């Protein structure tokens, strides 16, 4: 029965999974945690291990089977004491002491607030919170569900929020899995996401594609959404669906978007501010695809994360892409990184980030590159110490442009997830001026 359930879950969409587990009656302790290095003085544990004390701070917890999870986090680029975060379905977290204590509130909008939170800040301390739409409040029972991607903005550190804006798009179709990028020192907000003709449809005529839009006035208005992926996928929300689009903008003004499709990682480039796009480039393979099974995780996501080095260091301009896959077997999920030193024209062979012996699972990675140092930080779940589903959280960091990584366990104790609980699709990490704040989900019980 256990094996059957694992196979069954592989074919469930994310939203089907959320509906099913939300109807179960089980006792689960859910928590969102953030890693703090106490007494950092603008240095983190990874820069001076002996001078700091690791502490895991619980931001939020719940007995609800669908959340809080899918945390997103951002350190203010101008005041590292200010840290903001979000989680499904509508939670907003605010800290003004570097993440030691948190205030919790909920977003509201007439467009509906329904998960997939992405939270980012600009250089004026404005906060942007992107999420899925649920305008009638009836979610899966209404055709207007997922009819756009909404970005709400706060200009007073989360005390108040506008109702949200959104790019012009086809509201008959479904819109999901967005991400934001805010170039330093600008009013620009970049957003990419997946458009489904009909989410979860098995009809081969229904297709998926990657869309992009940009705002040049702090998310007040948006350019019309444009399709940038040359190949379209299915709508099943699996490896044959075009998903996991992340945008970045590099120092020369070029915009890049990466995503996964059909066991490959794709990259597209625009040199005119997102108006026109080039031919999609395959920059890495992803054997086993971006969605795969890990024991006790009903759905595991290995979608790629792209970033670049905007520091003045020796690796300035280098682009990085990070992902997870099962190229070494279904019992050996690993974390990978590839890099480009020629503006995305060519990419290195994959570099294995986790430094354990083969045969254990590492999964759910997320990456950030500190713009002040160029150091790379990757957070992920790790089972190297166990023969069962017990799970730790690790931070890997590189000071040499991704050539080598040091791995450090940052969770205080392991947890064991439950297959009947929606665990989300991602965690997050933010790195600014040597301050590192990874955030992750913990689930115990059942």
Predicted regions and their residues:
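Ala/Thr-enriched low-complexity intrinsically disordered regions
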Residues: 13, 29-31
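C-terminal PAP-associated
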Residues: 43-446
């Amino acid at each position: 029965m256990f094996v059957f359930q694992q196979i069954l879950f592989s074919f469930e969409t994310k939203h089907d999974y959320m509906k099913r587990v939300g109807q179960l009656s089980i006792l689960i302790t859910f928590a969102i945690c953030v890693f703090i290095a106490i007494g950092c003085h603008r240095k983190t544990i990874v820069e001076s291990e002996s001078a700091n004390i690791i502490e895991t701070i619980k931001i939020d917890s719940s007995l609800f089977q669908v959340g809080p999870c899918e945390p997103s986090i951002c350190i203010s680029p101008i005041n590292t004491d200010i840290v903001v975060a979000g989680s499904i379905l509508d939670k907003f977290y605010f800290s003004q002491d570097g993440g030691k204590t948190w205030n919790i509130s909920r977003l509201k909008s007439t467009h509906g607030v329904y998960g997939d939170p992405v939270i980012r800040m600009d250089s004026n301390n404005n906060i942007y919170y992107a999420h899925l739409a649920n305008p009638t409040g009836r979610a899966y029972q209404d055709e207007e569900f997922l009819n756009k991607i909404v970005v709400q903005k706060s200009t007073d550190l989360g005390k108040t929020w506008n109702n949200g804006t959104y790019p012009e798009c086809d509201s008959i179709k479904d819109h999901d899995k967005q991400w934001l990028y805010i170039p330093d020192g600008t009013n620009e907000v970049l957003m990419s996401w997946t458009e489904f003709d009909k989410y979860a449809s098995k009809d081969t005529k229904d297709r998926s594609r990657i869309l992009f839009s940009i705002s040049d006035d702090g998310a007040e208005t948006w350019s019309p959404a444009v399709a940038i992926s040359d190949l379209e996928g299915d709508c099943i929300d699996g490896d044959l669906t075009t998903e996991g689009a992340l945008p970045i903008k590099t120092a020369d003004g070029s915009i890049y978007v990466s995503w996964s499709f059909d066991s490959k990682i794709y990259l597209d480039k625009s040199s005119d501010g997102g108006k026109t796009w080039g031919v999609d480039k395959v920059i890495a393979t992803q054997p086993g695809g971006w969605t795969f099974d890990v024991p006790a995780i009903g759905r595991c996501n290995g979608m790629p994360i792209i970033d670049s080095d905007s520091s003045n260091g020796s690796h300035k301009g280098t682009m990085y892409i990070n992902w997870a896959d099962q190229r070494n077997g279904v019992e050996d999920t690993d974390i990978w990184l590839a890099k480009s030193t020629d503006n995305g024209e060519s990419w290195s062979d994959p570099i294995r980030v986790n430094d354990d012996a083969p045969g254990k699972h590492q999964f759910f990675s997320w990456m950030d590159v500190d713009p002040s140092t160029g150091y790379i930080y990757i957070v992920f779940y790790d089972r190297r110490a166990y023969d069962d589903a017990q799970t730790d959280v690790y931070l890997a960091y590189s000071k040499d442009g991704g050539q080598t990584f040091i791995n450090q366990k940052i969770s205080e104790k392991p947890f064991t997830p439950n297959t009947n609980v929606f665990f989300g699709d991602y965690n997050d990490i933010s790195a600014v001026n040597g301050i590192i704040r990874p955030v992750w989900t913990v689930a115990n019980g059942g």
